[in-house]
Amino acid sequence: MLGAVGRCCTGALQALRPGVTPLKALNGAPAALFSRRDYVAPAAAAAAASGRIVAVIGAVVDVQFDEDLPPILNALEVAGRDTRLVLEVAQHLGENTVRTIAMDGTEGLVRGQKVLDTGAPIRIPVGPETLGRIMNVIGEPIDERGPITTKQTAPIHAEAPEFTDMSVEQEILVTGIKVVDLLAPYAKGGKIGLFGGAGVGKTVLIMELINNVAKAHGGYSVFAGVGERTREGNDLYHEMIESGVINLKDTTSKVALVYGQMNEPPGARARVALTGLTVAEYFRDQEGQDVLLFIDNIFRFTQAGSEVSALLGRIPSAVGYQPTLATDMGTMQERITTTKKGSITSVQAIYVPADDLTDPAPATTFAHLDATTVLSRAIAELGIYPAVDPLDSTSRIMDPNIVGSEHYDVARGVQKILQDYKSLQDIIAILGMDELSEEDKLTVARARKIQRFLSQPFQVAEVFTGHLGKLVPLKDTIKGFKAILGGEYDALPEQAFYMVGPIEEVVQKAEKLAEEHS
């Protein structure tokens, strides 16, 4: 849409003033408006317009220029500092002053300090050289392994692909996690959201998906750590080195990491998701790859935007969020898509404040997703992990024409029996199991077995649980649940279904339990 507006404006301006070039005419417009993604070789900085700092308000810095006011989204650099401080233009205030967002701490800045316009948005290194490396929001390496020297750089702001470039093929992405593959399967090239409150297992689930999908995938992956714990980022990096996904000795690494963790200023947290996305877009557009993009956590992207929004002087919207919440989210999510050249399959963890899915931040994200995996505190309290809510999680590709009629029928059968059990829980709580009919007793028994069979030991959580991690093929998952629904395992105790892989392990566990009791 913006691209179309930009092109219309350019045409109109040329018609009105033939002597003026489109670039000159749109000089005050956002950089993304008149530039499709351009990949260029890193160039030496040309002579740039300079300004001076006139105000510093937390992460927001006002800069005054005598001439050549930089357009919106341009990157400015503070001169005379040991570490590079990048400011991104957010508003034009009048009187040749721009309001900018700092990408790093503003400690030590003083009024009157010189600032240089780089003449372009924030540009980061892209290409195969980024694999195996960790970079920050402005593309600087933070893994203490020297500079990232790439042949090309790209701006972090760009338009979404045209409708005509998009691909509409639909195929299931098998994760090896029973509850996900059966009830809310993920689409290749789709957008997947993991919703959950604090401490219900979003990051563990995303780590398991990285372990199962990224390793088996064989293509490239990008992980963007947005405002989450530094410890988790560090653990992930070292796990990837140990498992061989990152190879420090040669160039066979399969993953690029982009971090802007909890301790970063809001400017960095609000932009680091775009940096990670830009790295993924290069592999999709230039190398025709099928890329996996993991983002942990999208809520922190919104939260950082909210922190900055108040400092920029915008009037807050519902629940104190920025008034541009839907625009910010849409601008980023529309770029995560599958084109005819390649695909980006994104898995995004989304924190749910106070377990309220109607909060504007998670509610705005729902509209953009192909599959939603909702993690429930009530299920986590039962000790069932992953704590996926089988009745709340949805998928656009849960369609018999895509997944097949057997898969569809088994999934709907599982959901029906769990819903029936949920309806009976009030009666059980008041009157007890003895007051139920024989049919209802059977429903409850099977539902409790299914509930436990939806649990699964994770490879990334082996050290915590003591259970060996399991990866279950889709056909085994369907076979197992179909057999439980059909009553083939009614005789087995429900604890035999807890924390196992395929259905064969249930039988083995039941035999083991019987031996222990005897």
From Swiss-Prot:
ATP binds at residues 199, 201-204, 229. PANTHER family: ATP SYNTHASE (PTHR15184), ATP SYNTHASE SUBUNIT BETA, MITOCHONDRIAL (PTHR15184:SF71). This is ATP synthase F(1) complex catalytic subunit beta, mitochondrial. GO terms for biological process: proton motive force-driven ATP synthesis; proton motive force-driven mitochondrial ATP synthesis. Belongs to the ATPase alpha/beta chains family. GO terms for cellular component: mitochondrial inner membrane; mitochondrion; proton-transporting ATP synthase complex. Its EC number is 7.1.2.2. ADP binds at residues 199-204. One of its GO terms (molecular function) is proton-transporting ATP synthase activity, rotational mechanism. Its main location: mitochondrion. Keywords: ATP synthesis, ATP-binding, CF(1), Hydrogen ion transport, Ion transport, Magnesium, Membrane, Metal-binding, Mitochondrion, Mitochondrion inner membrane, Nucleotide-binding, Transit peptide, Translocase, Transport. Mg(2+) 2 binds at residue 228. It comes from Cyprinus carpio. It is an enzyme of class 7 (translocase). Coiled coil: none annotated. The gene is ATP5F1B. Mg(2+) 1 binds at residue 203. Homotrimer. Component of the ATP synthase complex composed at least of ATP5F1A/subunit alpha, ATP5F1B/subunit beta, ATP5MC1/subunit c (homooctomer), MT-ATP6/subunit a, MT-ATP8/subunit 8, ATP5ME/subunit e, ATP5MF/subunit f, ATP5MG/subunit g, ATP5MK/subunit k, ATP5MJ/subunit j, ATP5F1C/subunit gamma, ATP5F1D/subunit delta, ATP5F1E/subunit epsilon, ATP5PF/subunit F6, ATP5PB/subunit b, ATP5PD/subunit d, ATP5PO/subunit OSCP.
